[in-house]
C-alpha cells in the first residue's frame, strides 16, 4: 500500500500541475478535449486554478513535475524489491540519463523543440526527486529486509521483467506531455 502511495501521489500531483497550469496544447490536457461535457468542466476547473496561478513560483509549474515524475519512477523501481542494489544502479543510470538529457537541451534544444528547453531548476528537482526516493527506499529496504531464502531465480526474473515494463510505462508518461 505504501509503495502505491509513493508512486501514485507524486505522479497525480505532477500530472495535475500539467493539467491545470501548463499549455492546452500538451497531451494531458488534450485527453479531455475528446468529450464535450468533460471538456466544459475541465475548462471551468482550469479557469478557477488560473486565478491562483500568480501565487505559485514558476518552478512549481515548470520544474516540480519533473522531480515528482522521477520520484515516482524511483518508487516503482526501488521500494519492496529483493534486489535493491541492482535496482538502485538501474535507477541511478536513469537519473544520470535525465540530467544528461537536460544538459543536451542547452546545446540542441530550445522552446518548441522535442528535446525541450534547458533549465537548471529541472536538474535541481531531478536531483531532489532522486535523493528523496533513494533515502526513503533505502530506509524501507533496511527496515523490511526481505528474507534471503525467499530469493529465487524466478523472483529475480520476475523483478527484471517488471522493471522493463515500468521503464517503458514511465518513459511514455515522461514523453507524452511534450509530443503534442
Model-derived features: where do they sit?
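Bulky hydrophobic segments
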Residues: 1-180
Amino acid at each position: 500500500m505504501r509503495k502505491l502511495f509513493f508512486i501514485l501521489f507524486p505522479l497525480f500531483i505532477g500530472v495535475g500541475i500539467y493539467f491545470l497550469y501548463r499549455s492546452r496544447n500538451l497531451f494531458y490536457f488534450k485527453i479531455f478535449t475528446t468529450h464535450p461535457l468533460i471538456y466544459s468542466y475541465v475548462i471551468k476547473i482550469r479557469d478557477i486554478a488560473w486565478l491562483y496561478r500568480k501565487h505559485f513560483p514558476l518552478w512549481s509549474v515548470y520544474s516540480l513535475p519533473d522531480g515528482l515524475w522521477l520520484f515516482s519512477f524511483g518508487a516503482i523501481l526501488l521500494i519492496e524489491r529483493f534486489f535493491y542494489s541492482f535496482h538502485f544502479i538501474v535507477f541511478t543510470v536513469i537519473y544520470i540519463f535525465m540530467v544528461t538529457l537536460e544538459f543536451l537541451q542547452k546545446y540542441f534544444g530550445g522552446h518548441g523543440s522535442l528535446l525541450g528547453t534547458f533549465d537548471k531548476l529541472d536538474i535541481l528537482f531531478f536531483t531532489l526527486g532522486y535523493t528523496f526516493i533513494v533515502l526513503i527506499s533505502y530506509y524501507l529496504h533496511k527496515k523490511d529486509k526481505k528474507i534471503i531464502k525467499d530469493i529465487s531465480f524466478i523472483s529475480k526474473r520476475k523483478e527484471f521483467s517488471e522493471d522493463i515494463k515500468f521503464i517503458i510505462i514511465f518513459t511514455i508518461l515522461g514523453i507524452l506531455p511534450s509530443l503534442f
